[in-house]
A protein has these predicted regions:
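Helix-loop-helix junctions that connect adjacent transmembrane segments
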Residues: 88-89, 129-187, 212-272, 318-323, ...
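Helix-loop-helix module between adjacent transmembrane segments
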Residues: 32-113, 148-195, 202-204, 212-217, ...
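A generic transmembrane alpha-helix motif of multi-pass inner-membrane proteins
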Residues: 100, 108-109, 115-135, 139-172, ...
C-alpha cells in the first residue's frame, strides 16, 4: 500500500469528498473555502508534524482510545451517508447501511485487506472521472464556460425531467432551513398522503394553517409563503417554476453568501488540527518530497473534480437546490442528461465509487489504530470483537438521519483537541504522561462546549465560535498544559 494511497484513503472519506460539491452548490465561491482546507490541511500536517521513532509516550492508552473515538465518528458519518444515498435511490435506508457496514466489517477482520486499498481507490477514481467526462461531453461546454453560464442564469427553474415534477419524490430537507420559501405563485401536489403546514403572508397579516392532503390534491402558494412538510412526504412541483430554496439568480450564487466570516477561522483551526492528529500522531518518519508531491497532486485532482461536478450539476440539475442541498443527491443528481446509450450505466458509477472509497478508508483507519497499539504489534487493528462492536454501533446510530459532513467536522475537532497538541509539542520523555493529562483536558472542554452548542444555537460572531467549533478553545488549553509540562523544574 503506497504512502499516497494510504493518506488519501485516510483523509478523504466519501463524507468529506462528496461534501465538497455540495458546499460549492450551497454557497458558491464560499464553498471553495472548504475545498481549499481539504487540500491544504493534510499537506501542512505532513510537513510540520513532529515525527520521530517510537517513544514511551506511545505506550499510553489514551491516544488509542481518543483515536478510536475519532474513527468511530468517521465511520458513523459515512454510514449515515450510505443510508441517505440508499433512501435517495429508492431503497430502504437500512439496506445501504447494511451493504456498507457489512463490506467494511469483512475487510476489517481480514488481515490481508491492506493489499486491496490501491485497487479500491483506483476503482473509486474511475467511478468519479467517467461520469464527469460523460457529463461534460453531453453538456458540450468546458468547466470554465459552464461556471460562467451558471453565473449568468436569471434563475434556477425546475426541469421537466425532475423527479419532483413527475411522478413526485420524497422531499428531505438538506443543509439550511427546514421550510420552503416561495418567490412566485406555485402549485404543490401531494403524491401521497401528507399534512402540509403553510405560513401565508398577506401584507401585514400572517396566517398559519395545516392541510391534510390525499394523493392528487393540490395547494397553491403565493410569493412569500412558507411550506413545511412531514418527514417522508412525497410532493410534486410545477415544471418551469423557480426552485424553492435556490439562489435568486446565477449572479447571487456566484457572488456567494455573506455568512459569519468568523466561522471560517474556526473551521480552518478544526480541519488543520484534525489533519495533524489523524495523519501524524504515532507515525514514525517524515514523508519524502516525492511522496508529498504525489499526495498533493491527488488532492488537487479531487478538489478539481468536486468543483467541476458542482458546476455541471448546477447547470443541468437545478432541482438539487430544492429544500436545501443534501449531500446524497450529489451521488446521483436527479435530472442530469447523459449521452445516448449511457444513461443506464454511468449514473450508478458514482455511488459505487463512494462505496469503494469507504471500504478503502475503513481498512486504512484500522491500520492507523494499529500503529498506536500498546502491544507494539498492531493487534488492536485485528481485534474482531472490538471492530465488530464499533461497526455495529456506528451502523445502529446511522439508522437515524444526521448530517455526514458535520460528523466529519466533529471527528476532526475531537482529534484536534485531544491529539494534535501532543503531536506539535510532545512532552519530555520523563513526563510523557502529561500528554494524557492534556488530552483529557482537551476532551473535557471539547465535550462541554459541544453540548453547550446544541442548546445555544444561533449565536453569531466571536461569542458563538467556541460553541460551533469547540476545538478553538479545547486545543489551546491542552497545549498550555503541555507547555507547563515542558518547563524545567526548579531546584
Amino acid at each position: 500500500m503506497t504512502f499516497a494511497a494510504r493518506t488519501i484513503a485516510l483523509w478523504l472519506t466519501p463524507a468529506a469528498w462528496l461534501a465538497l460539491p455540495a458546499l460549492v452548490l450551497e454557497s458558491g465561491p464560499d464553498g471553495l473555502w472548504v475545498g481549499l482546507l481539504l487540500l491544504v490541511a493534510p499537506l501542512l500536517a505532513l510537513s510540520t508534524g513532529k515525527r520521530g521513532p517510537a517513544s514511551p509516550s506511545r505506550n499510553e492508552l489514551f491516544p488509542v482510545v481518543a483515536l478510536l473515538l475519532v474513527v468511530a465518528l468517521l465511520l458513523w458519518g459515512n454510514l449515515v451517508l450510505a443510508g441517505d444515498v440508499a433512501a435517495w435511490l429508492g431503497w430502504p435506508r437500512w439496506r445501504g447501511i447494511a451493504v456498507a457496514a457489512g463490506g467494511a466489517w469483512l475487510l476489517l477482520v481480514w488481515r490481508g485487506s491492506s493489499r486491496l486499498v490501491p485497487g479500491l481507490l483506483l476503482a473509486a477514481a474511475c467511478g468519479l472521472v467517467v461520469p464527469l467526462i460523460a457529463l461534460g461531453y453531453e453538456a458540450d461546454i468546458g468547466p470554465l464556460a459552464a461556471w460562467g453560464r451558471v453565473a449568468s442564469l436569471p434563475g434556477f427553474r425546475l426541469p421537466a425531467s425532475s423527479p419532483w415534477v413527475d411522478p413526485g419524490h420524497e422531499l428531505r430537507a438538506g443543509r439550511g432551513p427546514t421550510s420552503l420559501l416561495f418567490e412566485e405563485e406555485h402549485r404543490v401536489t401531494a403524491a401521497g398522503p401528507a399534512q402540509l403546514h403553510i405560513r401565508a403572508v398577506d401584507g401585514a397579516r400572517v396566517t398559519e394553517s395545516d392541510w391534510d392532503h390525499r394523493p392528487g390534491e393540490t395547494v397553491t402558494l403565493r410569493s412569500g409563503d412558507e411550506l413545511r412538510w412531514p418527514t417522508g412526504a412525497r410532493l410534486r412541483f410545477e415544471v418551469g417554476k423557480t426552485v424553492p430554496g435556490a439562489p435568486s439568480s446565477g449572479i447571487a450564487w456566484a457572488d456567494g453568501r455573506r455568512g459569519d466570516s468568523v466561522r471560517r477561522w474556526g473551521l480552518l483551526f478544526t480541519v488543520v488540527g484534525g489533519a495533524l492528529a489523524l495523519l501524524d500522531v504515532g507515525v514514525a518518519g517524515r514523508p519524502t518530497r516525492a511522496q508529498l508531491a504525489t499526495v498533493g497532486a491527488a488532492l488537487i485532482l479531487v478538489f478539481g473534480w468536486g468543483v467541476i461536478w458542482a458546476v455541471y450539476c448546477a447547470l443541468g440539475a437545478p432541482d438539487l437546490f430544492l429544500g436545501g442541498v443534501a449531500i446524497e443527491r450529489l451521488a446521483r443528481p436527479p435530472s442530469l442528461g447523459w449521452p445516448t446509450g449511457l444513461g443506464r450505466f454511468v449514473p450508478p458509477l458514482l455511488p459505487a465509487a463512494a462505496l469503494a472509497s469507504f471500504l478503502a478508508s475503513s481498512v486504512v483507519l484500522r491500520e492507523r489504530i494499529g500503529n498506536l497499539d500498546v502491544t507494539g504489534g498492531g493487534e488492536i487493528g485485528h481485534d474482531v470483537g472490538l471492530w465488530s462492536a464499533i461497526i455495529g454501533a456506528a451502523a445502529l446510530a446511522s439508522l437515524w438521519p444526521a448530517e455526514p459532513w458535520m460528523l466529519v467536522v466533529v471527528a476532526l475537532g475531537l482529534a484536534a483537541s485531544t491529539l494534535a497538541p501532543a503531536a506539535l509539542w510532545p512532552p519530555p520523555t520523563e513526563r510523557a504522561r502529561w500528554a494524557t493529562v492534556a488530552g483529557l483536558v482537551g476532551l473535557g472542554i471539547f465535550g462541554a462546549l459541544a453540548l453547550g452548542g446544541q442548546w445555544t444555537r444561533g449565536v453569531e460572531g466571536w461569542v458563538g465560535l467556541p460553541l460551533a467549533y469547540p476545538a478553538v478553545v479545547a486545543a489551546p488549553v491542552a497545549a498550555i498544559v503541555l507547555r507547563l509540562a515542558r518547563r524545567p523544574r526548579r531546584g
